[in-house]
């Protein structure tokens, strides 16, 4: 700061001290708000909130959740203790909570259910002496509190608010995020924290997929070692409801249920006897299984209105031998699936649930008229939209913050680049999600704006998915969850950069270049994924089929590997090829990405001390950076191995002793790589297990049946424990290669009367 600026700032501070303690806000209050409010007007003047403030209520009961949340969150986030005054207008500085039906008018909305939207509307008025939150109903009051909390900012040890006014309401009623616990399970206290975080972003629905992580009374054999009991599930349901979040049960059918059909007790319900992917849609016993499981979930989810009856990717409905006759009678595979949806959907409706389904292939547009209008279309299809609306069905907009990306969502895409000439092409369904050119946030916003802009459907909300297929930690999904749901609150006039930049201060508080952290994590994870090539593999059972058809003969799955290191000659340690030359582009990229990883680790460490909130989230982000770093170091260590072996070959004739010593150094690197890999994996596991129950074969008197999905090759399914994170390294035959090099080394040493060496590389072990 130059001298003139310092004098000017000093004068301003003195002037502020003489004029009622107002000062320019240390940062824009409006730019910390997510979702983006409908109407905002801030003055720019900021004042301190501290323990001298109180809270007063008007027509708000003592146990109202908005009041409780205000008091608890101010204390937890900012260390402010508000005195709770009696009802009525306060004296002195006070936060005033008011419920007054009809007090807040709402503007135009996409959702036609304006009654529901009015209940969520609020007005937040901030003045020097009072902050007043007025709402038509308790839900709106709660949302006004969340906005007020987001608007506060810590600066030099004090908490500031900015004067002004916000009038706000949602564009659509339901803002659902999908939490996928198919391959892991959060501890109960962690799940409550997650739900509380969702409520902070005005997320109103939490679709929770548990698969075997729920204690199904009707299907006890599928229950995994760690699972929520009915009591715990109801506890989560009630907790979510208190925060105006509906916990929505999620169950797949007829497809995506290997977690059920892999068990011997249910093999007779399969559509195909040699596939655990989907069940028969013409078997009454299969209907009973799904409905009984639904009943188990509903009994522990009292008060719920919705259920996700996920008909996702039911590719083979009508193609199984037992299905064909009924499909022909109805006039097609889509009509058979529509009949199944109708049959199950009607039963769910009788149980008081509105079912969301995937309106997609093999169903066709005409099949929509065969589905009951109480069914909710969970996937927007522009071509079918008018038919669905005319039929009386309501519509959700499906979008996703994560598909099959490794380690971290593609918030910022990495430009495509071919690193291997002989890598298997990406032809399978999950590898065709594209490059996500706009990044996850941009793609979500574009999808939502496109759908609502077409005005073809009776929209009721957005559904933001975060898939567990690739085994990511869902802590990495929050940027997408918060911004995707925010676009369901307001998308008109909102930009990708605006949503993203609002997320960081609202989620973390004070940060250091957090956007750079997310950019680097995105590109680091993308390089982690493409730095290994894809090859057919026999590490698991073959794949039964894909979206278009069942394979005549199941095809091998694919795994990632690296080009094999060359084996030295016994005679003179010469190498048949130079591994470094053949992989020059890969290794150059690895060196560059390691430099960027250094920047990433520095920023993460700085933010661990800088942020006000979400320290655990940063710990998880750091584990992602560590996994990327370990991969980069492995690649560069392989470069060093090749360099040492090349040097050994060049000195083998003139100085055998030096050549053997160089070979030993190369083998020592392999041992070090293994140890560093295991150390990183153990650190990652320990961090993730702070929130997760351990992934184990046995616990609580239950055993996990480890059998992979016959169609979907989800990496977390490859192993029982957390070693799926390093699975490709465990299967890369570097240990076998090192053993072969050791044999060559000892034979060469013997020829030159040099000592032998014994070693157990134990490459595939994750233990020290």
Describe the residue ranges of each PLM region.
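Residues at alpha-helix termini
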Residues: 73-77, 200, 242, 350, ...
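Contiguous, structured surface segment used for ligand recognition
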Residues: 23-172
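Feature activates predominantly on carbohydrate-active enzymes
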Residues: 110-349, 356, 463-467
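Flexible loop/turn segments at secondary-structure boundaries
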Residues: 63-64, 185-187, 213-217, 254-258, ...
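Short, Φ-rich (hydrophobic/aromatic) sequence segments
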Residues: 37, 64-77, 145-155, 190-193, ...
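Bacterial Sec-dependent N-terminal signal peptides
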Residues: 1-29
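Structural motif
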Residues: 56-64, 98-103, 136, 181, ...
